Amino acid sequence: MGRIHATGARKKYVHRDNLDIASFGERPRAWLLEHDFIPQELRQSWISITEQALQGVRHCYERAGDLRLLRLHGDCHTGNLLWTDQGPHFVDFDDSRMGPAIQDLWMLLSGDRAEMSRQLTDVLAGYESFFEFDQRELYLLEALRTLRLLHYSAWLAMRWEDPAFPMAFPWFNTVRYWQDRILELREQVALMDEPPLWPI
């Protein structure tokens, strides 16, 4: 990933959106509300927690300061990482856009806070062999996770009239789905108030 980012930092995209609070948070939230996807009995709770979540995201961005944006993979999780005898290969670049480098690193981490700190240490050791990482970006880790939650719900909702989507995602657009998202966002609000994850 360090090599990909070293290349990605050379030029900017002209025709792709940035990964930012507006495109991944504010606009998806507005779309879901305008199209009445939130069950009426949960609507006020969802409105309230998404407002709090976006305030938390903005605060994380303020703490991080002015950061370099580069061309990202954009959806870098282990399902998009294939290992061969020649090493790792990244696939599925259709979500590539401009954004902070941490977007392509945080989804590689899993487990509790201590485990993620250890994993982050290993990831950055390899990454910085090829490209420098600005540690201020660690303030964005939970903010980007929060934006992904909002964006993904809207992404599914925007495609819900496609007959393939209800078959592929039967759990979406149920009361239980939105209850779970409200709980997740409450957890994210708390996590964004904590000190950033740090390599050990």
Predicted segments with their positions:
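A cross-family kinase active-site recognition segment
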Residues: 1-45, 69, 168-169
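All-alpha amphipathic helical-bundle segments outside canonical DNA-binding/catalytic cores
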Residues: 16, 135-145
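Active-site acidic catalytic loop and adjacent metal/ATP-binding pocket
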Residues: 4, 58-105, 200
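ATP/Mg2+ or Mg2+-diphosphate-binding catalytic cores
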Residues: 36-37, 154-200
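Mechanochemical coupling/switch segment within NTP-driven translocation systems
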Residues: 45-60
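Short, mixed-charge aromatic SLiMs
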Residues: 22-32, 128-134, 171-188
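Hydrophobic alpha-helical segments that form the core
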Residues: 22-25, 144-154
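Active-site activation/catalytic loop segments of kinase-like enzymes and analogous catalytic loops
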Residues: 101-132, 148-164
